[in-house]
Design a protein with these regions (language model features):
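N-terminal structured subdomain of primase-like DNA metabolism proteins
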Residues: 1-97
Length: 97
């Protein structure tokens, strides 16, 4: 009998919302509007230099240049995980409806 692989897809809609994700990471976001500021975890930081976009989780550090398009990219960089491992960590891999 032939073994069958079950596809366990990535589910972008299952990623946590940026406000919840960054709060759970212990990061305090300050400011108003579409972009917020916080300390950057990718370098020693004493003044908030990381900007986070609240609709997508996109981020950019104005000091070290770290950047990405969503909370998944942030998680991958912060914890050194690949795409699949980070998606699994965030509950967005293979989650079915």
């Amino acid at each position: 009998m032939e073994a069958r692989m079950t596809r366990r897809p990535f589910r972008r809609d299952q990623l946590p919302d940026p406000a919840s994700y960054f709060a759970d990471e212990g990061m305090t976001l300050t400011g108003q509007g579409e972009w917020r500021s916080t300390l950057c975890p990718f370098h020693p930081d004493t003044h908030p230099s990381l900007r986070v976009r609240m609709d997508s989780g996109g981020f950019r550090c104005m000091t070290c240049g770290a950047h990405g398009g969503d909370v998944l990219a942030f998680h991958m960089q912060r914890y050194g995980q690949g795409f699949k491992d980070a998606a699994q960590s965030l509950g967005a891999w293979g989650a079915g409806r």
